[in-house]
Swiss-Prot record:
Basic residues bias: start-end ranges: 92-112
Organism, as annotated: Homo sapiens (Human)
Designated name of the protein: General transcription factor 3C polypeptide 2
Modified residues (Phosphoserine): 63, 132, 165, 167, 220, 260, 597, 871, 892-893, 901
Annotated SUPFAM superfamilies: WD40 repeat-like
Swiss-Prot/TrEMBL WD repeat ranges: 366-426, 427-483, 484-535, 536-603, 604-654, 655-690
A single Gene Ontology CC term: nucleoplasm
Length: 911
């Protein structure tokens, strides 16, 4: 019988051949796989060649028990069984093949070779086959070699010799052919096995979930264990006096978006667990710590945690980026300070000599109904329980700033401010104007956290200016203050600070302010009080250059920003025409610095660019990196700038008309106050806007129904304060803006009112006001349009919140009143807004970081201490800073005589 060629086995229909009937052999399953493999590799020309396994006749099927014999019987049957390949070749019938092709499924080029009979098959010896991987390398088809069918049968017979064992965990070495799919090679199985092992290694090597520093480790993020411990902040500091109860424990906050669960144990192909990367603009991939429980002040710990974190960050920043001494050439000179007489100072003084009537209602204290009216440059004593202070400046307040003091100095606090001379005066922005004005410096005493201020706020001295309205003023952030008792040779005076003024005549004036004690010691005993001085500024900053100077091109200077990091050599100013100008203060360039005949300096900018299409209303530097600056203009745009590439902003946002903004130290964004004329319905108020790096959406900090005139942020507290046209001053604790604020729940718990001012009409006389309308908080809308008409028939009612504690805050009356005002507006724009708040400033100093000063249209300036946000952590920082400051700057005392008598020696008489 003809053979079918090397590597090809054709099996015909099963039937009796001689005395032997061909039935399914133990290698039929392997032959089925070979059949599928061979059929998949056949070309179109070989489609006619078919190969199939014999189908057993009815009654001759083998049962599973018959196919699986014991090892002894299998070995005996194998010895008695002839070569299966030769027997199958004998019973197979050759099929017609095309000329020039070799039967066996492989195409061979060239002339047809004469067919040779198959060599006798070798006995089934295990050593002839590679035990490790028989199919790892393809065998060349040569004469004398066995076919694939023979090799597979040899492999099968060898496996039959082995005793039955448990199925190995690793995949089989041969091919696997799932139904309807191509054969799966061993390389794919090895790769899958490698991925499974890699997944197991990664799952064991992944770090544990991140928890609060110095806190207990959370073993399972899904089932945290309650641990009794003091309150801990993310910054890693324990807070003394924190409640040690079972309600406070650290728990990993569950993500809003559920993570996909890991593969089940029944899954045959688990996917590797790889840590997920966090793209920009998405929530943090790592699990953030979350503080449960309540803080001692009544606020939840998760609200107070950013406050404690900001204390650490601000302290570290000031130690690295602030300086103790800068601008050594600008020391106050006594002969430049000319004391004005009463007649000379009269044009510069505000016109109003008495304040409007006002009353103060304090939450939790009985109402006394006392009406106050104080004189110009006078104040009232601080309240013994609430520590609030009030004084009258004489006119509407439009500029305000604290004098920076080094950490730990323990010195008196000062604020500089500007009030308009006339209560009814308007200030056009489109043209330059000049006129008399008074810059005021007020002393507030040593403001502490432990005790009420012992001294009243007092008017220290004033500076007469002829440059019109002062729209903004800024102190040098550090390096300009020295001890009041610093010995200086006359005429030098100890310096209090460097102050820059943005004036309506387009100029920027720079003053070197002396300490009041040293300056007042120079005046005669019969000097006029209050002390008003005419001062020569140390430098005048103008736009343009030496050959082209026209201040009218840029218009009024509306905003200032001092470089926040040492050496503070750059000062930025925003103008009416949209120009932002930068001066290099210590420059020696003859093109930027000119010495005038009176000894003062005139400086020209080294850089300027057009930032907005209209007036630049506010500027702020990035405290973390001085290369970045943000500006807001009347074109409703907020722009972030990289000063190394000022030709294009790195981000521009057009939202609404911004009035003021604050860029807090820890965060990559700004908090913006807005005018409600362009605000969308329901979105008027205070927003936090990301600079664009993280891609977070705007966070709605607090809704407001009126225009928010001023906004201030405290780096120490991570808190912002805002005053609006309705006379309400509120504060809001920002969440951790390093994380996406979209997941912040119940922002109403983060804000609280400080006080609310209402204009209340009285019926008959100032001594008999309508206290019923005052207590109800719903004033009748008056129609007075001038200051005189308003104060003749109305008084101001200040309703203060108890800031010592925030327990049960959401159900307290000031909080309910604030929420009611956020729902509907009570503004009456047909009258003078005497209760409006124009300026708000948090203290930047560590010694008084919880104090807040505010003032507005009435000319009354009020000082409050947010005692509830002060913590033992801040108090400990104050003590450490005072010890460090005293060790560095304590003046050496002169040698004193000893307080005891020297030892005397005398001879004793002899007995």
């Amino acid at each position: 019988m003809d053979t079918c060629g090397v590597g090809y086995v054709a099996l015909g229909e099963a039937g009796p051949v001689g005395n032997m009937t061909v039935v399914d052999s133990p290698g039929q399953e392997v032959l089925n796989q070979l059949d599928v493999k061979t059929s998949s590799e056949m070309t179109s020309a070989e489609a006619s060649v078919e190969m199939s396994l014999p189908t057993p006749l009815p009654g001759f099927e083998d049962s599973p028990d018959q196919r699986r014999l014991p090892p002894e019987q299998e070995s005996l049957s194998r010895l008695e069984q002839p070569d299966l390949s030769s027997e199958m070749s004998k019973v197979s019938k050759p099929r017609a093949s095309k000329p020039g092709r070799k039967r066996g499924g492989r195409t061979r080029k060239g002339p047809k070779r004469p067919q040779q009979p198959n060599p006798p098959s070798a006995p089934l010896v295990p050593g002839l086959l590679d035990q490790s991987n028989p199919l790892s390398t393809p065998m060349p088809k040569k004469r004398g070699r066995k076919s694939k069918a023979e090799l597979l049968l040899l492999k099968l017979s060898k496996d039959l010799d082995r005793p039955e064992s448990q199925s190995p965990k690793r995949p089989p070495e041969d091919f696997e052919t799932p139904s309807g799919e191509r054969p799966r090679r061993r390389a794919a199985q090895v790769a899958l096995l490698y991925l499974q092992e890699l997944a197991e290694e990664l799952s064991t090597a992944l770090p544990a979930p991140v928890s609060c520093p110095e806190g207990p480790k959370v073993s399972s993020p899904t089932k945290p264990k309650k641990i009794r411990q003091p309150a801990a902040c993310p910054g890693g500091e324990e807070v003394d006096g924190a409640p040690r109860d079972e309600d406070f424990f650290l728990q990993v906050e569950a993500e809003d978006v559920e993570e996909s669960e890991g593969p089940s144990e029944s899954s045959s192909e688990p996917e590797p667990v790889v840590p997920r990367s966090t793209p920009r603009g998405s929530t943090s991939g790592k699990q953030k710590p979350h503080c449960r429980g309540m803080a001692p002040n009544g606020l939840p710990n998760h609200i107070m945690a950013p406050v404690w974190k900001c204390l650490h960050l601000t302290k570290d920043f000031r130690e690295q980026k602030h300086s103790y001494w800068e601008f050594a050439e600008w020391i106050p000179l006594a002969w430049k300070w000319h004391l004005l007489s009463e007649l000379e100072a009269a044009p510069y003084l505000p016109q109003e000599e008495k304040s409007p009537l006002f009353s103060v209602q304090r939450e939790g204290l009985p109402e006394d109904g006392t009406l106050y009216r104080i004189n110009r440059f006078s104040s009232i004593t601080a309240h013994p329980e609430r520590w609030d202070v009030s004084f009258f400046t004489g006119g509407p307040l439009w500029a305000l700033d604290w004098c920076p003091v080094p950490e730990g100095a323990g010195a008196s606090q000062y604020v500089a401010l500007f009030s308009s001379p006339d209560m009814n005066e308007t200030h056009p922005l489109s043209q330059l104007h000049s006129g008399p004005g008074l810059l005021q410096l007020w002393g507030l005493g040593t403001l502490q956290q432990e005790s009420c201020p012992g001294n009243r706020a007092h008017f220290v001295y004033g500076i007469a200016c002829d440059n019109g309205c002062i729209w903004d003023l800024k102190f040098c952030p550090s390096g300009a203050w020295e001890l009041p008792g610093t010995p200086r040779k006359a005429p030098l005076l100890p310096r209090l600070g460097l102050l820059a003024l943005a004036c309506s005549d387009g100029k920027v004036l720079l003053f070197s302010l002396p300490h009041p004690e040293a300056l007042l010691a120079q005046q005669p005993p019969d000097a006029v009080k209050p002390a008003i001085y005419k001062v020569q500024c140390v430098a005048t900053l103008q736009v343009g250059s030496m050959q082209a100077t026209d201040p009218s091109e840029c218009g009024q200077c509306l905003s200032l920003a001092w470089m926040p990091t040492r050496p503070h050599q750059h000062l930025a100013a925003g103008y009416y025409n949209g120009m932002v100008v930068f001066w290099n203060l210590p420059t020696n360039s003859p093109l930027q610095r000119i010495r005038l005949s009176d000894g003062s300096l005139k400086l020209y900018p080294f850089q300027c660019f057009l930032a907005h299409d209209q007036a630049v209303r506010t500027l702020q530097w990035c405290k973390a990196n001085s290369h970045f600056l943000v500006s807001a203009g009347s074109d409703r745009k907020i722009k972030f700038w990289d000063l190394r590439r000022p030709y294009e902003p790195i981000n521009s946002i057009k939202r609404f008309l911004s009035t003021e903004l604050a860029w807090l130290l820890p965060y990559n964004g700004v908090t913006v106050a807005q005018d409600n004329c362009y605000a969308s319905y329901g979105l008027c108020g205070i927003h936090y806007i990301d600079a664009g790096y993280l891609g977070f959406k705007a966070y709605f900090t607090a809704p407001r129904k009126g225009t928010v005139w001023s906004l201030s942020g405290s780096d120490w507290l991570g808190t912002i304060a805002a005053g609006d046209i309705s006379g309400e001053l509120i504060a809001a604790i920002l969440p951790d803006m390093a994380l996406n604020p979209i997941n912040v729940k119940r922002p109403v718990e983060r804000r609280f009112p400080i006080y609310k001012a209402d204009l209340i009409p009285y019926q008959d006389s100032p001594e008999g006001p309508d206290h019923s309308s005052a207590s109800s908080g719903v004033p009748n809308p008056p129609k007075a349009r001038t200051y005189t008409e308003t104060v003749n028939h109305h008084y101001l009612l200040f309703q203060d919140t108890d800031l010592g504690s925030f327990h049960d805050l959401l159900r307290r009356e000031p909080m309910l009143r604030m929420q009611e005002g956020e729902g509907h507006s009570q503004l009456c724009l047909d009258r003078l807004q005497l209760e409006a708040i124009h300026k708000v400033r948090f203290s930047p100093n560590l010694d008084s970081y919880g104090w807040l000063v505010s003032g507005g249209q009435s000319g009354l300036v009020r000082i409050h201490f947010v005692r509830g946000l002060a913590s033992p952590l801040g108090h400990r920082m104050q003590l450490e800073s005072r010890a460090h400051f005293n060790a560095m700057f304590q003046p050496s005392s002169p040698t004193r005589r000893p307080g005891f008598s020297p030892t005397s020696h005398r001879l004793l008489p002899t007995p």
